[in-house]
């Protein structure tokens, strides 16, 4: 099974990140959401808190076939 990592940073665009996660999972891709900080709870651009599957310090990037970087502010 193919694997993708979706990175989440505070201020991420919820629709870009979570819409992408949804579509990839529907397509049979194993998706892991990753907070770029030590805190797994990340707040999106519209103040929606999302709990990532894991954090950057715990993930092995070499396991992924694709890396997804959603947009957002502050950038």
List each model region and its residues.
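Extended, subdomain-level signal for the structured scaffold at the beginning of enzyme domains
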Residues: 1-75
């Amino acid at each position: 099974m193919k694997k993708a990592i979706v990175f989440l940073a505070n201020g991420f665009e919820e629709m870009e990140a979570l819409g992408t996660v949804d579509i990839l999972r529907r397509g049979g891709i194993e998706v892991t959401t990753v907070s770029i900080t030590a805190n797994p709870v990340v707040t999106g651009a519209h103040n929606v808190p999302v709990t990532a599957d894991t954090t950057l310090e715990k993930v092995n990037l070499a396991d992924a076939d694709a890396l997804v970087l959603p947009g957002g502010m502050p950038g």
